[in-house]
Amino acid sequence: MAFLTKGLKIVLRDERPQEPIEKTFHYEGGIKEFVEYLNRSTTPLYEQIIYCEGIVNNVSVEVAMQHNDSYNENSYGFVNNITTPEGVTHIVGFRNALTKTFNDYARKNKLLKDNEPNLTGEDIREGLTAIISVKIEDPQFEGQTK
């Protein structure tokens, strides 16, 4: 929760022991710090975490991502701070847009020849850590338990 809402401070205090224990969760960088945390046991391929945010039609979107030296993709989606399954629209849209952007860049800059096939999404997302956070009014979650 603290990663997903930059500036939010959550303080947990256990007063049961003689000496109370307190733990504070506060991440001013929000999802950028979340990506940094998830990549702590890997070596990033570039220093700066790619980050963008915007609001359109009362929908707020934040994306933070960074490639690392692992072979695994770790992309996580959230709607209103609730984790979402892998196949939801904002994750699929992010993956498709990322693949298209890489391929368009590669073609425009002659990194791929006209007769060569496009890069696959799996190749582009290898070693990728990404957080996609969407905030919307009146969300509808399939299978949501009340």
Where do the PLM segments sit?
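GHKL/Histidine-kinase-like ATPase module
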Residues: 6-145
